[in-house]
Amino acid sequence: MSASPSSTEPGIAGAASGGASARVQAVQAPVIPIVAGWIRETPGTISLGQGVVSYGPPREAIASLASFGGELADHRYGPVEGLPRLVARLEGKLRDENGLDVARGSRVVVTAGGNMAFLNAVLAIADPGDEIILPVPFYFNHDMAIVLAGCRTVPVATRPDYQLDLDALAAAITPRTRAIVTVSPNNPSGAVYPESALRAVNDLCRARGLFHIHDEAYEYFTYDEPHVSPGAFAGAAGHTISMWSLSKAFGFASWRIGYMTIPEALFDAVNKIQDTNLICPAAVSQHAALAALEVGRPYCDAHVRVLAQVRTLVYSRLATLGDLVEAPDARGAFYVLLRVRTALDPYVLAERLIREHKVATIPGPAFGLTSGCSLRLSYGALAPDTVAEGIDRLVAGLGTILRATA
């Protein structure tokens, strides 16, 4: 049975002899490929692991590709920050849906997905050795980007319901702190932060001279809770960096289109970073994104209504485990972050669930949860009937394993 993966302590000799840099070795091993390897070795596994949706792009986005490629300009490098017509369309979307007027001190930059937007932000605002505060549980790619940039992740525990602990966030600030990160709706917990909490974080960042980085990739995936964009708060433009992705809302995961709003003062820095790493977002993906945005939010909303029903089923099945697990109510995204009452290592439990019960989840340590045993399950990637079968396997597997090890 595999042990929990950990960073390798690099040495000078290792780097000098052709090994990876100390900076890269310090980054946590990506968890998705680890779990994917176990799944490949166990045919027939139902994956409640990776955070993707079960649907693809709107047919209008695919149909739009027929009109792409006929002009020589379609095959040239485009603007670093994205095609002007897509940037303009996003500015309208942000104004109409998020209440964010980018004309008041912000700029829009199109990126190759939300992860690039986050790395752009970190590289633009932080120097090696600087600190960035991540509420725990955190999205593992955020931690990976911070460490890759030579900075330090400062994990701060959330409350038992995975809501922000504002006092703890304030107490974690040091002279090296550059930003506080929030993700709402949250990956991995599914928590939706209320306006009061996000406003408090935004005000704290402004008062202490920090940036507020806010990830809104799951903005449409809420269940009876409003979504809030801190960038729309009065006075927020100068210190707020927000980011979005088309991967979830429009089924665009492989097309790699995201976007970010940044203070005007950071525009040149972000463009320099993106020009170095990407040159420009792929024109064909931007072309399809324009068509998807014309279809708009109703496309995603129809799928969210189905997910709401699946969510109800997931919680009802998990309830049959009684006090073996705790599943805090998640009002957003398509995740449940289970606390499992066991002394088993989370990676060991996750691997056993795959090999013995053919159902995959993601171990909690990938999200910064270093005490206890937690598993994240995703119910967004599969058809409702398949999710039901996967949850039944998970419930049966947890019941069998936990009762045998009690």
What are these regions (language model features)?
Residues E216:
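Walker B catalytic acidic pair
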Residues L290, V306-Y315, A327-R339, S371:
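Conserved glycine-rich beta-strand-loop-beta hairpin in the small C-terminal domain of fold type I
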Residues P5-G14, G238-A308, R317, L398:
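Conserved core segment of the aminotransferase class I/II
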Residues S6-A15, S21-A112, N120, A292-V295, ...:
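N-terminal small-domain helix-loop-helix segment of the aminotransferase-like
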Residues D74-D203, Y220-A234, D392, L402-T405:
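Conserved core of the PLP fold type I
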Residues C151, A207-L210, A236-G238:
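A short helix->loop->beta-strand "cap" motif at the edges of active sites that frequently abuts
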